[in-house]
Amino acid sequence: MSTSNSSIPASMPRWRQYWVLTKPRVTQLAVFCAVIGMFLATPGMVPYPVLFGGIAGIWLLAGAAFAVNCLIEQAVDAKMKRTSWRPSATGEVTPFHIIIFSIILGSLGMIILWNFCNPLTMWLTLATFVGYAVIYTWLLKPATPQNIVIGGLSGAMPPALGWAAVTNGLSAEAWLLVLIIFVWTPPHFWALALYRRDDYVQSGLPMLPVTHGERFTLLNILLYTLILIAATLLPYIYGMSGIIYLISAIVLGLMFLAYVIALFVSYSDALAKKTFRFSITYLSLLFAALLIDHYFL
């Protein structure tokens, strides 16, 4: 999961410097998907200790993972206009302090998940932390243009974390939610990479628009969007959802596809940015439709 950040003044209060290292908007979307997973896992209300403990624990571990991401990409972020303002890139927060901050957040998150949810949720969330901060950020991102595909599982895990928090297990329904986010991630991220490709050229990271060009990236966005639309029908086919979700999935999928086709036919950075932003709205509305369908049908 990713979101675009606008430029923020270099002089920030100390608390805000640490706050932005957690990438709060990305964390918010991840926690939202985890909460959806919690509610879909039960026909009734999620127990309040599990709900609020899960939110807090997942938020803290996600924030720790993003802070480690900022630490690992400190030199890369300094080269990119989109990320050069980050306190890690400017040196306003030192690597030592980022490590301590991440350890504190991660430890608190693990303790909360163990005590308010269950050990399975804690271990799954910790594995997601390692998958994102180490496997994706450190190993895959600088090595292959397919980094977002291969490493996408860690970003797709939040619904499964929420599901596990409630049920202390993972079922096929939980993995369907993971599949949707996994397939959604490439077109979402590559739209960003297209209109920020100059940044990625500067960074030296082998992102698809840099290594394979605009047209190849657009073709991949189109193909993954078609796969995504098919994947979003699976909850209905499997019997996990009803007609409200089905109609929503079709309408939202066609809207997303319209953006992608327009981008494929006549590319512009402005349209790529709109497509990227709509992809976030798309996922939020899709999961909201699942939740409404779950409780009202």
From Swiss-Prot:
CDD domains in the cross-refs: PT_UbiA_Cox10
Gene Ontology cellular-component annotations: plasma membrane
One annotated GO molecular function: protoheme IX farnesyltransferase activity
Miscellaneous notes: Carbon 2 of the heme B porphyrin ring is defined according to the Fischer nomenclature.
Family per record: Belongs to the UbiA prenyltransferase family. Protoheme IX farnesyltransferase subfamily.
UniProt-listed PANTHER family: 4-HYDROXYBENZOATE SOLANESYLTRANSFERASE (PTHR43448:SF7), PROTOHEME IX FARNESYLTRANSFERASE, MITOCHONDRIAL (PTHR43448)
This protein's name: Protoheme IX farnesyltransferase
